[in-house]
């Protein structure tokens, strides 16, 4: 009986420690989906000079991307970025003339960082945000490095 109680207490303690390993958060956009005129999506593997761009203008596609980001599970966790990572960026162009940028850096399978300097956050995610690029059925065109959402040094 004492062994069982000790084992139960140990399990409860371990579950509590695992639960404290990182609080899950969600993106709370400071704008509504109806405020988005278009979304510029950029992707490159390794070096920015290889960047490509797609521009999402259909209201249903904009709403789909907006909802996918709001439903993401993110955690405050430090992740080391690797050189030559795949980067997928999103620029939400809003009807008031401003924009909101998201940058996803894939550091491996189920290991990525989503950051926004306009939103002032940086989170870990195990979601494959890079796959959003392939889900957008639009033609990709070459993008200039100067067009890409900026990451401060």
Task: Please give the residue ranges for each predicted region.
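Repetitive helical segments and hydrophobic/amphipathic motifs
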Residues: 11-12
